Each structure stands twice: as C-alpha cells, then as structure tokens.
Regions:
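Transmembrane beta-strands of outer-membrane beta-barrel pores
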Residues: 1-5, 45-51, 78, 87-93, ...
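Outer-membrane beta-barrel translocator domains and adjoining extracellular loop/strand segments
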Residues: 5-13, 52-60, 95-104, 142, ...
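Gram-negative outer-membrane beta-barrel transporters
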Residues: 4, 89, 111-201
C-alpha cells in the first residue's frame, strides 16, 4: 500500500497537488531443479507494481506501471568455470519509459507507454584459464518493444505500431581479462553497447550509435606481507584506444504552426553527451 501526497510550488513556479493511493500485491515464486553437483535449472515468476515518482507527477498525470516477469535459466558451476544463462520475458502495462525529453531543471521526463515488453537472454561466464589468468564476460541480447505506440505528429494522432523502447540497446557486452602475478595485476576490460533510440517513435534523428570502449588497469603492491604498512600503486587508462563516442543524450519534439497555411509541422531536436577520449588516473594508497 502506497499513499502519495504532495502540495506546494515547483519550478516555474507552478502549483502541484498530488493525492494518490495505490494498493499493490507483488507475489514471487520460483523452482530450482538440481541436475547434478555442477548443473541446475530454475524457473521464476514475479509480479511487480511501481508507483510514479515526484518528477513524473510534476510532468504529467502518470499511472503506476505493472510488470509480469518470467525467467528460465541454467547454472553451471565447476572448479574452473561458472556459467549462467537466463531467458526472460517482462510484460508491462503502463510502463514508465523515458521520452528523451528533459524538464526545466534537466531531469528526464517519463510517460506511460501502454502495453510493452522486454524479451531476451543473458549469458555470464567466469573462467579461470590458469592460476594467474581469469576471463569474465557477459552479454545481453534483447528485444524491447512498445506495442501500438501512439504519437501526435503534424497535428494528427497516429499509430506507429510496434516501436523500440527508448534507451534500450538490444546488445550489451562486457569482458574482463584479469592477470595476477605475485604482487602485481593487470586488468583489461572492454564494453560494447549497441545502437539505441533516445525516443519511442523510432526516429532516425533520435538514434544513438553503438560504441565499443576499453580500459586498462595496472596495479603494483609493495610490502604486501608487512605487518606495519602496505603501499599500493595504481595506473588506470580509460578509453584506451581513444574512441570518440556519445553514451547518452536527449531527444525532443515540438509543433510549429504555419500562420499562412494553418498547417502544423512536428519538429525534432536532439542533443548528445560526448565522452572523454583517452585519459589517465594514477594513485598511491598507503595502508597502515
């Protein structure tokens, strides 16, 4: 049970008056089947309800979102390798999705999308190749869809059909190779994020290109066996290959009225948050 009340002025200034009550029931259930000492299968179902936040109420009249989450997985655990696979289907009603727009204080605006779903698979692997070398990686492949999404374009409300949910790349991959020898370690990490849309209308203007970045961390420790103090040196190279990319941004639309023809034209705009090129961080830690 959630009781949400707020009364007062917000930026503008404008008066906000919220009086909302929600009664939620969020059951969860699952089964695990042990195949042998190394493998098990599992299935789970959960019901989730979530109320809008204050910013959502300030920017509209939102409804709480409702989720039915189904998951099916396999786990492998052995001496050298751990592997997890997870199939998921998340069916939403009134999911609160980002529109791509920002409010007057720069906070992202969300809206209810009606019916939507997320369907995909997650794979995770932790592999001890040797005593001194490990390789950890994970990948997520998904389809994230708004069903029959409506949008006001050029003065008319149109059904765009199925569209991609904003800020939901279909592919995310990360990998870490960890080398440990004595009192030194080297970690090479890589991350790939596929292309995504910053809005829910599948506009090419709102598309954010995929990117692939790598980091390198070098660590060296002195006096590691000392009972008095330890000295730790770290050198971190971010964006090792100096990739130029934007990891986020915003997308907005507005209507422009032609005073001569009386026609309404929907204009699209976009902004990006470019990330830093190759950069470094060094540190020394003295531990007593």
């Amino acid at each position: 049970w959630v009781d949400y009340n707020s009364n007062g002025y917000v930026a503008g200034p404008s008066l906000i008056n919220i009086e909302e009550s929600h009664n939620f029931f969020n059951p969860k259930a699952g089964l695990t089947y042990k195949l042998n000492n190394f493998n098990n299968l599992y299935f789970s179902y959960s019901k989730g309800n979530k109320e809008p936040n204050r910013s959502d109420y300030e920017n509209g009249s939102p409804l709480p979102e409702e989720l039915d989450d189904f998951e099916l997985g396999w786990r492998l655990k052995s001496k050298k390798i751990n592997f997890n696979s997870n199939l998921f289907y998340m069916n939403y009603k009134n999911q609160l999705v980002l529109t791509g727009e920002l409010d007057d204080v720069g906070s992202p605006i969300r809206t209810n999308s009606g019916d939507s779903y997320r369907l995909g698979i997650e794979l995770e692997k932790n592999w001890d190749l040797f005593d001194f070398l490990k390789w950890n990686s994970n990948i997520s492949l998904s389809k994230n869809i708004n069903k029959s999404f409506y949008f006001q374009r050029n003065g008319s409300l149109i059904n765009l059909g199925d569209t991609n949910i904003s800020y939901s790349p279909s592919t995310i991959f990360s990998s870490r190779i960890i080398y440990n020898r004595g009192n030194s370690s080297i970690i090479f990490s890589n991350k790939y994020v596929g292309e995504q849309y910053m809005g829910n209308i599948d506009s090419e203007t709102s598309k954010l290109d995929g990117y692939n970045t790598s980091d390198l961390l070098i660590n060296y420790q002195l006096f590691e066996n000392s009972d008095i103090f330890k000295l730790d040196f770290k050198f971190h190279i971010f964006n090792l290959f100096n990739k130029l990319y934007s990891s986020n941004g915003y997308f907005y639309t507005y209507d422009l009225n032609d005073s001569l023809s009386g026609q309404v034209n929907t204009i699209e705009g976009v902004g990006y948050y470019p990330q830093a090129g190759r950069h470094f961080m060094a540190g020394v830690t003295l531990e007593f």
